[in-house]
Amino acid sequence: MARVDGRESGELRPITIERGFIANSPGSVLFRAGATAVLVTAQLSESVPPFLEGKGVGWLTAEYAMLPGSTPGRKRRGPDGRATEIQRLIGRSLRAVVDTRALGPWTIHVDADVINADGGTRTAAITAAFIAV
């Protein structure tokens, strides 16, 4: 059975990955899966949250947002339950594969911004974040 966009049920969306998309960010990726596009940056700061101070481990945190023009109807700026859930999921997913002990007292800040939403934004953001880190 074909989907609305013409793909077969087992066919993936075309994927493109453009690393180094933002010159001022040590890790940046423009990730596209079909018409969905997510821009992710990863940057370091020499600090950790208070609960980790003095423990010799680092941290990874994530933020996720959908730009107002990313959906057919204008998406309001600001936090909402879905965005909060997704940014926590991104953080947890990456902390599961990043050796925070090797970071020392540093934090990796991941920012994921959906610039065009056409389905699969959560998985696109997680994948792009992994590439950016």
Predicted regions and their residues:
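Short, structured loop/turn "capping" segments at alpha-beta junctions
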Residues: 100-108, 121-123
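Glycine-rich, flexible beta-strand/loop modules in the N-terminal catalytic cores of phosphate-handling
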Residues: 21, 26-103
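Glycine- and Gly-Pro-enriched alpha-helical subdomains that act as flexible
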Residues: 118-133
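A residue-level signal for beta-strand positions that form part of recognition/binding surfaces
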Residues: 14, 59, 107
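A short, contiguous, amphipathic alpha-helix enriched in charged residues
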Residues: 2-10, 84-85, 129, 133
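A short glycine/serine-rich beta->alpha loop
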Residues: 75-79, 112-121
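Short, Gly/Pro- and small/polar-rich lid/capping loops
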Residues: 1-25, 29-32
